[in-house]
A protein has these predicted regions:
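Alpha-helical transmembrane segments of multi-pass membrane transport proteins
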Residues: 1-272
Length: 272
């Protein structure tokens, strides 16, 4: 809430300030959580009611939340990047560094699109209320510090420990959990039963991921042992006569098609 409010105030003179604030918040949450479900759920609970109250169109509101909320799949420390690095036997740090630019570029395109469509069609993104347009300048410093320092601290703690080689991804996850706990204590939001609920949710998520990993690995081993990959390679390379670029375009089209009915984890484990 503090972050969303702060970014709205900072962008108050820009068309579509609230939608831009939601996109910025989605980018920051992506760099903090590394998982889509957490970002989309949190943004829907925080941002959607606010956008509805301010008169944003349903299509605009849902589109902004869905697009910016899914940045967690690409911006480090994405769980998908960690699994991809393990499957391809590549350093997680290198994969993280390679994904930073595409992730931030996509976020920048979202911001440009939202600002453009808000300026072209003001009815989709009404101006901010008066109380947000008249925030005293003296309140901006403490507001920015309170809103941005905690996420910057957590992002630096997680990514810095990995990129500098101080911790493995698993250890960095523990560091991030410790940092998030400290922030919750500092903000007075660590209540009775919170840690138990977090541990239960984490255990369920990890169990589901491992079940999918085991199932997909068994499928891949059986498929390859029966010569399925050789058949596909023969059809694509020899029959279709595709070069490297043609192969890349075909694979991207297949992944795009699979995305309609499979989650990222299943696609990653099957395709790679």
């Amino acid at each position: 809430n503090d972050l969303l409010y702060c970014v709205q105030v900072l962008l108050k003179r820009v068309p579509g300030a609230l939608a831009l604030a939601v996109t910025v918040m989605g980018t920051i949450l992506a760099a903090m959580t590394g998982i889509i479900g957490a970002s989309v759920t949190m943004m829907t609970a925080l941002a959607l009611p606010t956008m509805m109250r301010q008169g944003y169109s349903h299509a605009m509101s849902c589109g902004v939340i869905a697009a910016s909320g899914t940045l967690g799949i690409l911006i480090p420390p994405s769980i998908m990047l960690i699994i991809m690095a393990d499957l391809m036997a590549i350093s997680v740090g290198n994969v993280f560094m390679a994904a930073v630019t595409p992730g931030l570029t996509l976020a920048a395109f979202y911001l440009i699109y939202v600002a453009t469509i808000s300026a072209a069609k003001p009815s989709l993104a009404p101006p901010l209320p008066e109380h947000l347009l008249n925030v005293p300048k003296g309140e901006m410093g403490p507001l920015i510090a309170k809103s941005f320092l905690p996420p910057v601290f957590l992002i630096t703690l997680i990514k810095g420990s990995i990129l500098l080689g101080w911790a493995t991804p698993s250890e960095a996850g523990a560091v991030g959990a410790f940092g998030a706990t400290l922030l919750a204590i500092f903000n007075g939001r660590l209540k009775d039963g919170t840690l138990v609920e977090v541990c239960n949710t984490s255990a369920k998520t990890v169990s589901m991921i491992f079940f999918i990993v085991i199932s997909a690995t068994c499928f891949a081993y059986v498929y390859r042992s029966l010569g399925g990959d050789d058949v596909v390679e023969h059809l694509i390379v020899e029959k279709a006569g595709l070069d490297a670029w043609g192969m890349l375009i075909l694979i991207m089209a297949i992944v795009f098609f699979l995305g309609f009915f499979l989650d990222w984890l299943e696609i990653t484990l099957i395709v790679l």
